[in-house]
C-alpha cells in the first residue's frame, strides 16, 4: 500500500477494487485472470475501433484487445506467466516436497523416546522457572511492583541466585533420574554424566524464558538481566558470551521436543571425565541425535533454517565451553561456593 493511502486501492486497468500486485501491476482479480488466460492462449486480438475503447469496471469485457493493451500499459509482464508445462512442473515439485516431508516420520521407538523425555521434562523442569518467586527475590526483580507472596523479607541478590541455581540443578537431577535409559547406567557413570551436563541442561531449559527483544530472562513474575549477573559477581565478558548463546538459540524458535532432545544429547556425552561405559553412552547419544535429526526433517520448512540440525550441534559444542567457563566463574565469586554446595560439587 502506498504511504498515506488508507482507503481501498483501485485496479490500474479497470478501476475495480484491487486485490494486490499481479504480474507486476496493482490489479483486481478479474483483470489478473483475464491477463493470465489471454497470454496463455496466445491468440491475436484486434480492436475494431482502432484501440480507442474505454476500459472500466462496467465495460472491461467489451474489447479484449484494448483491455490487454491497458494491462500492458499498467506494467503487467507476459514473462511472469508460467506456461502450462512450467506450471505443471512446479506443482509436481511442490507435491514431491510435501511427500518427502510426510515420509520423514519418527519410528515408533523414536516416538516413545520423545514422549518419555517430554513426560520427565514436564514433571520436573517445565514449570520450575515459575517457582523462582518462592526463593524470596529482591524487589527489583519483579516485572511489576507487587508484594511478595510470603511474609518473609527478600534475600540479597547473591543468596537468591544461589538458591534458584541449586533448585534448577535439583530439578535437572530429578529429570535425569526419571529416564529409564539413564537409570540403566552404572551409578558412577550417572554421577559423571550429571556432573558434566547439569549446568548445560539448565541453560537449554532456561533458553525458553529468554526474551530476544529485551535480552532478559522472564521467569514467572521475575525478570533477570545481564546487570543482575554482574552484580552477583560474574565477569561481564562471560555474561556477554552467555547471552549471545541464548539469543542465537532462541532465534531458532525450537519446539519442546527439540529442546528436550538437545538436553538428552548433552546428558549422554561419552567423553565426560570418569565415564566407564563409553560405547553404551555413545550409542545412547547417537539415538538422541538421530531422533532430533528425524524430528527436524519431519517439520515443514517454512521459517526454519535449512541447516538447523548442524547449527544445533555447533551450539552444543559452544555450550560445553560456556559450561567450563561457568565453573571457573562460580569458583571465583566470593562467598558463592559456600552457599551452593551442590553446584560446587557439580562444577568441581
Curated annotation (Swiss-Prot):
Pfam families named among the record's database cross-references: Hormone_recep, zf-C4
One BP term from GO: cell differentiation
PANTHER family: NUCLEAR HORMONE RECEPTOR, NUCLEAR RECEPTOR SUBFAMILY 1 GROUP I MEMBER 3
Complex formation: Heterodimer of NR1I3 and RXR. Interacts with PSMC4. Interacts with ECT2. Directly interacts with DNAJC7; this complex may also include HSP90. Interacts with CRY1. Interacts with CRY2 in a ligand-dependent manner.
Protein name (Swiss-Prot/TrEMBL): Nuclear receptor subfamily 1 group I member 3
SUPFAM superfamilies per UniProt: Glucocorticoid receptor-like (DNA-binding domain), Nuclear receptor ligand-binding domain
Record feature DNA-binding region, as residue ranges: 8-83
Family affiliation: Belongs to the nuclear hormone receptor family. NR1 subfamily.
Function according to Swiss-Prot or TrEMBL: Binds and transactivates the retinoic acid response elements that control expression of the retinoic acid receptor beta 2 and alcohol dehydrogenase 3 genes. Transactivates both the phenobarbital responsive element module of the human CYP2B6 gene and the CYP3A4 xenobiotic response element.
Subcellular localization, as worded in the UniProt entry: Nucleus; Cytoplasm; Cytoplasm, Cytoskeleton
Keyword Repeat attributed: no
Keyword terms: Activator, Cytoplasm, Cytoskeleton, DNA-binding, Metal-binding, Nucleus, Phosphoprotein, Receptor, Transcription, Transcription regulation, Zinc, Zinc-finger
Entry's Gene Ontology cellular component terms: cytoplasm; cytoskeleton; nucleus
Residue span, NR LBD domain: 109-348
Keyword Amino-acid biosynthesis assigned: no
Domain characteristics, as noted in the entry: Composed by a short N-terminal domain followed by the DNA binding, hinge, and ligand binding/dimerization domains.
Matching InterPro entries: NHR-like_dom_sf, Nucl_hrmn_rcpt_lig-bd, Nuclear_hormone_rcpt_NR1, Nuclear_hrmn_rcpt, ThyrH_rcpt, Znf_hrmn_rcpt, Znf_NHR/GATA
Source organism superkingdom: Eukaryota
Main location: nucleus
PTM annotation (Phosphothreonine): residues: 38
PTM (free text): Phosphorylated at Thr-38 by PKC, dephosphorylation of Thr-38 is required for nuclear translocation and activation.
Zinc finger (NR C4-type): 11-31, 47-71
GO molecular function: nuclear receptor activity; RNA polymerase II cis-regulatory region sequence-specific DNA binding; zinc ion binding
Gene name linked to the record: NR1I3
Amino acid at each position: 500500500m502506498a504511504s498515506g493511502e488508507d482507503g481501498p486501492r483501485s485496479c490500474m486497468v479497470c478501476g475495480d477494487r484491487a486485490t494486490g500486485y499481479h504480474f507486476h501491476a496493482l490489479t483486481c482479480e478479474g483483470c489478473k485472470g483475464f491477463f493470465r488466460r489471454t497470454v496463455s492462449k496466445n491468440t491475436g486480438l484486434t480492436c475494431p475501433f482502432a484501440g480507442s475503447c474505454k476500459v472500466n469496471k462496467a465495460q472491461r469485457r467489451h474489447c479484449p484487445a484494448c483491455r490487454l493493451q491497458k494491462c500492458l500499459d499498467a506494467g503487467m509482464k507476459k514473462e511472469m506467466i508460467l506456461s502450462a508445462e512450467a506450471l505443471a512442473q512446479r506443482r509436481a515439485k511442490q507435491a514431491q516436497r510435501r511427500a518427502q516431508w510426510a515420509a520423514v516420520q519418527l519410528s515408533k521407538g523414536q516416538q516413545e523416546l520423545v514422549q518419555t523425555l517430554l513426560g520427565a521434562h514436564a514433571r520436573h523442569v517445565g514449570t520450575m522457572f515459575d517457582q523462582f518467586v518462592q526463593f524470596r527475590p529482591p524487589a527489583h526483580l519483579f516485572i511489576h511492583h507487587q508484594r511478595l507472596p510470603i511474609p518473609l523479607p527478600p534475600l540479597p541478590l547473591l543468596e537468591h541466585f544461589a538458591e534458584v541455581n541449586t533448585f534448577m540443578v535439583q530439578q535437572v537431577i530429578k529429570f535425569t533420574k526419571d529416564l529409564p535409559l539413564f537409570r540403566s547406567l552404572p551409578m558412577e557413570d550417572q554421577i559423571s554424566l550429571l556432573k558434566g551436563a547439569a549446568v548445560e541442561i539448565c541453560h537449554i531449559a532456561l533458553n525458553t524464558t529468554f526474551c530476544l527483544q529485551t535480552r532478559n530472562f522472564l521467569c514467572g513474575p521475575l525478570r533477570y538481566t545481564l546487570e543482575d549477573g554482574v552484580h552477583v559477581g560474574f565477569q561481564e565478558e562471560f555474561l556477554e558470551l552467555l547471552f549471545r548463546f541464548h539469543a542465537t538459540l532462541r532465534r531458532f524458535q525450537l519446539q519442546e521436543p527439540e529442546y528436550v532432545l538437545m538436553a538428552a544429547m548433552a546428558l549422554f556425552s561419552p567423553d565426560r571425565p570418569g565415564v566407564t561405559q563409553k560405547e553404551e553412552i555413545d550409542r545412547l547419544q547417537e539415538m538422541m541425535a538421530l531422533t532430533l535429526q528425524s524430528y527436524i526433517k519431519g517439520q515443514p520448512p517454512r521459517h526454519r533454517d535449512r541447516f538447523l540440525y548442524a547449527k544445533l550441534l555447533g551450539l552444543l559444542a559452544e555450550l560445553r565451553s560456556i559450561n567450563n567457563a561457568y565453573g571457573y566463574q562460580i569458583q571465583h565469586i566470593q562467598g558463592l561456593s559456600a552457599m551452593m554446595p551442590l553446584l560446587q560439587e557439580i562444577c568441581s
